[in-house]
Amino acid sequence: EMQRSLVGSEMCIRDSLFSEPLPSPQELYAAGGLDGLLERTLSYNQKLKAFGVNVNFAPVCDVSTNPDNFIYARSFGQDAQTTADYISSVVPVYAQSGVACVLKHFPGYGNNADTHTGIALDARPYTTFEKSDLVPFESGIAAGAPFVLVSHNIVECMDGAYPASLSAKVHTLLRDTLGFTGVIVTDDLAMDAVKAYAQDGSAAVLAIQAGNDMIVTTDYQTQIPQVIAAVQSGEIAESDIDAHVFRVLHEKQALGLID
């Protein structure tokens, strides 16, 4: 089983496991520059590895320089290129520690509202994403990041009908335009931004149809049978399931979890 963590302001692992909580990337960068941040990131992930954690849902690639934005405190807090430089430097640190990293929240939060509590519409033009939001993701992918997490934002210039996590168009952008060949994972399907699009509980089916390889959810008892039924009916092609499983198994092999 893959285990997960979150770091800094993303903290999910119990603080009691560590002598002190890990500060956010912004705080570490302000205190010790990029070198200090990378050193602490390596140390933290080595501890996670010792605890049996093999996937860390970080780093945050979202570009935000406005403290009033929802995502700001969780972001690097710098412009697109500085954030991209951080991402390209930190991805190899995760690899060095033996803990896989997850670039998030594709295609970028910007100044959007919190999708934990409702729908977030992003009306910015695609040129803004090209010049800003996508740059850190491109940097992380080029550095070899094995996972990308897709947000629930509705990005109108990419797909105005569905949240990014449920959008085949957004996943095609990630695969074909950005050239990502690793594992795509959803943001939490229990978040309110998704519920309006899957009121019958079919979020996992929609997510797999969109192109996600892994699902973040707590509603397994309902969603697993729905996915199985969708495969049996042909609503989800078995060849697609095979492709998703292959990518997950490839990453498990890279982490030394299977031979």
Residue ranges: model-predicted function:
Residues R14-L22, N54-A73, A100, K104-L121, ...:
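Active-site-proximal loop/short-helix segments
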Residues Q78, D85-Q232, A237-D240, R247-H250:
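Second-shell residues forming the walls of enzyme active-site clefts
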Residues E1-C12:
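Single conserved hydrophobic/aromatic residue that forms the stacking wall/gate
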Residues S43-N56:
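Acidic-leg catalytic submotif of subtilisin-like serine proteases
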Residues A30-Q46, A80-D85, F129-E130:
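Glycine-rich anion/phosphate-binding loops
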Residues S19-G32, G77:
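A charged helix-plus-loop insertion that forms the helical arch/lid used to bind
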Residues L249, Q253-D259:
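A short C-terminal boundary segment appended to hydrolase-like catalytic domains
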